[in-house]
């Protein structure tokens, strides 16, 4: 039986010269890194989020007026670039004054470190659609451009302004200068109910971005072509919840009955011998699917729905997943929400070989927002997200309870944006 990788190469019409050559090539590329894994370290933690305010008076005014309600702020999306860690604070509820920010990578503070709004307080002001409204996720490409997903449109009623979903490109080498704003029309992401959730960047054929729309009304996979400055959306039954995967209990008895659509996604590393693979999974599902990127890039296939025949069911994971990421050796790291755990699977092996590499019911509650730096480190956040998006759950200000943790582990590889042969910077 062929591996999922070999099967998809054949399906897409790409043939290797010989099976022996294929096995030797893949074996060379999947050798484990020669770096010791020390286990996950909790690098930073927060019991609540606060900001570097322009003045003490502005802080007091925000607290008194309700513009700043610390119990309502969720912290997620860590991305490391140079000397900063960028984080997101989506507006699931009122009282979130800034949706994108950063803190220093090197600091003596490890608990409740203050967040500086990025690129400015003004850009985070919710009164105008040109500003950031509710950022869920970001990704930073190899040139230092941050692709910011401002597409959580369930928050429009919170902001009091109906803004279309958008993606903002910021140059981190120029203090976050905005170089492009991509506004998505309603047929791509709903102005009321859209939920652009996660993204990966494919710097081939002029750069493409693949985005999951976790909308409960119109879920799908959005493809954006940078060269064409065009977007299209693919919809399929594989992107809907698996009802049997709900009803699990985490976080000291919190039952999760939420039915979430397509959410986590990961892109295989670049290789000269085949198109890349995009893996995705609904939030409420044990099922993992994939499709080759040459199919996704073909807008004509997307428009006539024939692309669906190329969607492949990879197999069953150990549980539901929110965040995931792939390194440049084909290792998929993904969260397991029901188990409060993180798992690892190499895509050149059967999915049944996947293993749980860390589990902790106290500190690994809702693992999400996986990312990698240039030094071979894997980052993720645990953020108790379930407490925020369940509307009937009352949030209290509990400054003694740690709610958000950014964990780090050294894996000795680079992110999916790099080829097999590129090693991390020591």
Predicted regions and their residues:
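Beta-propeller domains
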Residues: 26-68, 82-123, 157-159, 163, ...
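Surface-exposed loop and turn segments in beta-propeller and other repeat-based domains
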Residues: 45-67, 111-130, 179-191, 232-256, ...
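Beta-rich, blade/repeat-based domains predominating
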Residues: 68-82, 126-149, 187-209, 240-277, ...
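Conserved beta-strand positions in repeat-built beta-propeller and related beta-rich domains
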Residues: 87-93, 148-152, 203, 210-215, ...
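Beta-propeller blade signature
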Residues: 99-107, 162-174, 223-227, 395-413
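Short loop/turn segments immediately following beta-strands, especially the blade-tip
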Residues: 104-109, 172-174, 226-231, 291-302, ...
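Blade-loop segments of beta-propeller domains
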Residues: 106-147, 151-155, 160, 182-187
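Blade-level signature of beta-propeller repeat domains, shared across WD40, Kelch, NHL, RCC1
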Residues: 371-426
């Amino acid at each position: 039986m062929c591996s999922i990788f070999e099967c998809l190469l054949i399906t897409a019409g790409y043939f290797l010269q010989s099976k022996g050559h294929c096995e030797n090539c893949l074996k060379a590329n999947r050798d484990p890194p020669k770096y010791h894994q020390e286990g996950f370290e909790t690098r930073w933690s927060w019991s609540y989020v606060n900001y570097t305010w322009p003045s003490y008076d502005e802080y007091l005014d925000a607290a008194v007026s309700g513009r700043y309600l610390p119990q309502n702020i969720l912290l997620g999306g860590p991305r490391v670039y140079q000397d900063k860690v960028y984080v997101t604070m989506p507006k699931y509820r009122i009282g979130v004054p800034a949706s994108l920010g950063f803190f220093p990578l090197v600091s003596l503070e490890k608990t409740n470190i203050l967040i500086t709004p990025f690129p400015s307080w003004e850009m985070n002001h919710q009164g105008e659609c040109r500003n950031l409204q509710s950022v869920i996720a970001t990704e930073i490409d190899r040139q230092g451009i941050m692709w910011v997903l401002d597409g959580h449109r369930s928050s429009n009623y919170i902001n009091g302004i109906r803004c279309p979903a958008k993606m903002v490109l910021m140059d981190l080498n120029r203090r976050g200068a905005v170089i492009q704003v991509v506004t998505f029309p309603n047929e791509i992401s709903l102005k009321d109910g859209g939920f652009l959730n996660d993204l990966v960047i494919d710097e081939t054929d002029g750069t493409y971005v693949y985005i999951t729309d976790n909308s409960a009304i119109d879920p799908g996979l959005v493809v954006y072509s940078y060269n064409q400055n065009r977007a299209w959306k693919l919809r399929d039954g594989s992107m809907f919840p698996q009802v049997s995967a709900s009803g699990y209990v985490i976080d000291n008895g919190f039952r999760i009955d939420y039915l979430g659509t397509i959410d986590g996604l990961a892109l295989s590393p670049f290789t000269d011998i085949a198109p890349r693979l995009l893996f995705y999974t609904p939030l409420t599902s044990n099922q993992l699917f994939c499709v080759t990127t040459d199919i996704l890039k073909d807008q004509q296939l997307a428009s006539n729905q024939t692309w669906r025949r190329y969607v492949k069911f990879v197999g069953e994971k150990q549980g539901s997943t929110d965040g995931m990421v792939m390194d440049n050796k084909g290792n998929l790291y993904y969260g397991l929400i029901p188990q409060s755990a993180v798992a690892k699977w190499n895509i050149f092996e059967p999915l049944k070989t996947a293993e749980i590499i860390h589990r902790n019911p106290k500190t690994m509650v809702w693992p999400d927002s996986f990312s990698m730096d240039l030094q071979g480190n894997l980052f993720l956040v645990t953020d108790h997200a379930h407490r925020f998006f369940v509307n009937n759950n009352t949030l209290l200000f509990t400054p003694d309870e740690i709610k958000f943790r950014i964990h780090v582990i050294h894996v000795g590889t680079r992110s999916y944006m790099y080829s097999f042969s590129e090693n991390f910077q020591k």
